[in-house]
Amino acid sequence: MMFTFGKPLNFQRWLDDHSDLLRPPVGNQQVWQDSDFIVTVVGGPNFRTDFHDDPMEEFFYQFKGNAYLNIMDRGQMDRVELKEGDIFLLPPHLRHSPQRPEAGSRCLVIERQRPKGMLDGFEWYCLSCNGLVYRVDVQLNSIVTDLPPLFDIFYGNVGLRKCPQCGQVHPGKAAIEAVARGDQP
């Protein structure tokens, strides 16, 4: 019998074998490549300033530690808590920013591969007025390899970080460092 993705794997062994990739600076690893699903394990601590606009549903299983999703919905910021053992199915196009403040926390995230032409959006919002500061759309193939260059472009360009509504400059990477220290950005 031929199994496209191999025989069943022991998930705990896989986690142990990839533990060095599940903490900063990498923080995540895809379990299988070239499947219809993007199956990723994300480890904490991990903070993000972007909001993901996924055109498809995302499944979260917070199997170790706690995390939360910052949600931007119709100009209002909200928060969805993910406690250890929780599962959550995020609807398509709900802007979300996963935050994993606990070292050693682990979340299994399952997404569908996007058909050609179906783009994911990544957005940054003003910390003063909640206005949209910047958005980029991309054909997403791998969150592990596709996202860092997008973030580097935003963080490296002060002009992209200036809010068109109130003029406030998004702190960029400094916001991540502030949150990691326990400060407000």
Swiss-Prot record:
It holds the Pfam family 3-HAO. The keyword Metal-binding applies. It catalyses: 3-hydroxyanthranilate + O2 = (2Z,4Z)-2-amino-3-carboxymuconate 6-semialdehyde. Pathway: Cofactor biosynthesis; NAD(+) biosynthesis; quinolinate from L-kynurenine: step 3/3. It comes from the Bacteria. Substrate binds at residues 58, 100, 111. O2 binds at residue 48. Inhibited by Zn(2+), Cu(2+) and Cd(2+). Fe cation 2 binds at residues 126, 129, 163, 166. The keyword Heme does not apply. Its cofactor is Fe(2+). GO terms for molecular function: 3-hydroxyanthranilate 3,4-dioxygenase activity; ferrous iron binding. CDD domains: cupin_HAO (cd06123). Changing residue 96 to A: Loss of activity. Catalyzes the oxidative ring opening of 3-hydroxyanthranilate to 2-amino-3-carboxymuconate semialdehyde, which spontaneously cyclizes to quinolinate. HAMAP family: 3_HAO. Homodimer. This is 3-hydroxyanthranilate 3,4-dioxygenase.
